[in-house]
Structures are given as structure tokens and as C-alpha cells.
């Protein structure tokens, strides 16, 4: 884990009695639209908790949120964003609870995925209790923040969508990022042979994570090397759906996590037809946020799964962190640490 220093933002103040620092955007664009501001500290509703944030990890959705990609514009406002603070995967300590909260109390260390509500790139955030799990004492805040979305997609993609079974051949496309580094550790628990595809800068790390075979996508086309796979977990979806189905074994499953809008639409339109006329299944991984965090706690505490964190940044360095993340060279997760002066 490394630390990347950079120039800090100038704080912009507002007239609020109780305030906090947060990364805010009020229009779509590049990282230049992101500002570090002082805004009102949130107050939890009856069914919410107030969390003092200590770490947040970056996901693809964070990029799409402020860049205003088509899907995010449909969800978050066509011309002007409704949600103005990115960040979903958070870890921190509960500072206050609403009257209807039963599961947690002030002082509890928690983590979870706030997708749909966002607000994680801040010193404080409110969340419903069903979006959180207790953080094991042995787990750092940075590790906890790295888990929610990436680990849930990996676990649910393999176990639920992919119906993974012992003895299978698994290929993970985009294997060196957050989802892929969790997926290989989970897949090893099932006793499968795992091939990972990514860029050359990630291959050594991937080998150390337990991949049986690694492929540099610039040097070898895994859809034309004559090998077949029982299950493909695709984080990138950067090829035609017919390329993927060509290397799927009979009764194989192609599980789609994410990727380019064009390829996702192609899979959405043609997938049912391909599944109908062949024995091969084309499936999208439907994320059930936070569903299996307690199970991930068990895997972490027994040493079976450990988050891979490439770099950490400060809250005022979020634009730099997002630029690095957007380059696609990160190994595992990128984490923002939030320091408090009080």
C-alpha cells in the first residue's frame, strides 16, 4: 500500500454552525468539477445512523456519477446532478443513531455500500442500518472500505449467477482490479482452475494472488487460443458477446459484472436469444448490496480472503485518485483515507 501526496484544495466555507468537509460536484464533467467544500454536517433521520467516515474506496460508479455517463444521467438527473457527493463504499465509526435504529449504537465500527444514496467522500455520512455491517476489530478501516461492492460482485457473480462448482475452469476478464482480486480468492475456495486476463503491469500481482494462468490481453487473445471455460466472470465486457460464447464450454455460463454501454446493450439484446438456442447461459450479475458482508467477515477473520489495496489518498486528493483509477492500471482497490482534526 502506497501513499501519493499532492497539492491540497483551498477550502470553500459556507455559513453553517456545524459543518464538515466533503467532495462536491454541481455539474457533470472531468475531475475539474470536483471541489472540496465545507458543507452542513448531516443529521440522521429516525431510521438512520450518522457515521464518522475514516475510509472510502473508489468504484466505477463514482466515475460515471460525476462524469455524467448515460446511465447515471438517467438515474441522477439529465442535465444537473441530484446527488452531489460521490462515494459509496465507506468505513467508519457510528457517532449518533436515530430513535428507530436497533442494530447499532454510537461507537460501533461499521462498513457498507451506500449505492443509491452516496455521500461517502466526506467526513460524515448518514446511512440506514441495513446498509451496514460491523467491522471486525482485526480489519483496518481501509480494508473494510475496499470490500463492499467489489467483494459482493465477486461472490455473488461466482456463487449465485455463475453457479460455480469444484473442478471447473474459470476465466476472469479484468482480473487485476477490485472485483477480480476478490474473485480469485473466493474461486480458490471452490477448487477451480482460474485464468485471469488483464494488462501486463498487473500480471505479477495476479500470480501472487493465486491465478493458475494469466494472460496479457495485448499479447494474447483468449477467445482465439483454443481453450474453453465453464464460467466466465467479465468485469470489462470489452468484446463481442459472440467472442465470449465461442470459448464457453457446453452448459457454460457467461456472468457479466460491468463494461462498456454498447457491449452491455448487445448482451442484453442478444443474450436471451443465445441462451435459448444453445446450452450456454448469458447472465448479468444483479448486485445485492451488503447481503454477504457477514460472510466476508468470516472469510477475512479466517485468513481466506484479504483486500488488495494499491494506493491510498487523502480526501483532498480525490480528483487525483479518480484520475489514477480511471487509467485502469490500479492493482486491486484504491482507497481514500479521511483524517479528522477533532
Labelled PLM ranges:
Residues 3, 14, 63, 68-84, ...:
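Alpha-helical membrane-targeting segments
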Residues 40-57, 71-116:
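Glycine-rich beta-strand-centered segment in the early N-terminal region that forms part
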Residues 79-80, 88, 96, 103, ...:
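NAD(P)H dinucleotide-binding glycine-rich loop of Rossmann-like/cofactor-binding domains
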Residues 109, 169, 252-253:
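Short glycine-centered segments of the SAM/dcSAM-binding site in methyltransferase folds
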Residues 145-216:
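Mid-domain Rossmann-like dinucleotide-binding core that forms the NAD(H)/NADP(H) cofactor-binding site
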Residues 223-231:
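A short acidic, Gly/Pro-enriched loop at the edge of an enzyme's catalytic core
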Residues 239-302, 338-342:
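Glycine-rich phosphate-binding loop and adjacent beta-alpha segment
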Residues 288-342:
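C-terminal hydrophobic helical "lid"/dimerization subdomain
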Amino acid at each position: 500500500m502506497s501513499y501519493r501526496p499532492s497539492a491540497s484544495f483551498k477550502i470553500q466555507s459556507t455559513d453553517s454552525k456545524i459543518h464538515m468537509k466533503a467532495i462536491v460536484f454541481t455539474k457533470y464533467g472531468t475531475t475539474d468539477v470536483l471541489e472540496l467544500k465545507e458543507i452542513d454536517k448531516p443529521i440522521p433521520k429516525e431510521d438512520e445512523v450518522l457515521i464518522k467516515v475514516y475510509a472510502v474506496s473508489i468504484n466505477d460508479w463514482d466515475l460515471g456519477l460525476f462524469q455524467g455517463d448515460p446511465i447515471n444521467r438517467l438515474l441522477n438527473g439529465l442535465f444537473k446532478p441530484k446527488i452531489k457527493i460521490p462515494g459509496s463504499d465507506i468505513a467508519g465509526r457510528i457517532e449518533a443513531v436515530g430513535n428507530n435504529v436497533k442494530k447499532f449504537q454510537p461507537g460501533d465500527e461499521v462498513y457498507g455500500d451506500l449505492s443509491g444514496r452516496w455521500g461517502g467522500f466526506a467526513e460524515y455520512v448518514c446511512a440506514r442500518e441495513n446498509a451496514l455491517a460491523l467491522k471486525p476489530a482485526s480489519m483496518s478501516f481501509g480494508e473494510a472500505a475496499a470490500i463492499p461492492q467489489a467483494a459482493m460482485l465477486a461472490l455473488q457473480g461466482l456463487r449465485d449467477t455463475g453457479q460455480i462448482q469444484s473442478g471447473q475452469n474459470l476465466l476472469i476478464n479484468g482480473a487485476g482490479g477490485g472485483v477480480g482480486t476478490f474473485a480469485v480468492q473466493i474461486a480458490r475456495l471452490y477448487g477451480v482452475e482460474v485464468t485471469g486476463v488483464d494488462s501486463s503491469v498487473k500480471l505479477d500481482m495476479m500470480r501472487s494472488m493465486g491465478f493458475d494462468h494469466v494472460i496479457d490481453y495485448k499479447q494474447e487473445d483468449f477467445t482465439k487460443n483454443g481453450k474453453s471455460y465453464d464460467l466466465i466472470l467479465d468485469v470489462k465486457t470489452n468484446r463481442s458477446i459472440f467472442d465470449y460464447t465461442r470459448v464457453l464450454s457446453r452448459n457454460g455460463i457467461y456472468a457479466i459484472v460491468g463494461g462498456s454501454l454498447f457491449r452491455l446493450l448487445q448482451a442484453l439484446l442478444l443474450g436471451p436469444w443465445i441462451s435459448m438456442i444453445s446450452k450456454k447461459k448469458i447472465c448479468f450479475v444483479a448486485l445485492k448490496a451488503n447481503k454477504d458482508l457477514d460472510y466476508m467477515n468470516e472469510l477475512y477473520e479466517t485468513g481466506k480472503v484479504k483486500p488488495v489495496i494499491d494506493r491510498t489518498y487523502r480526501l483532498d486528493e480525490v480528483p487525483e485518485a479518480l484520475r489514477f483509477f480511471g487509467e485502469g492500471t490500479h492493482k486491486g482497490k484504491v482507497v481514500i483515507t479521511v483524517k479528522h482534526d477533532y
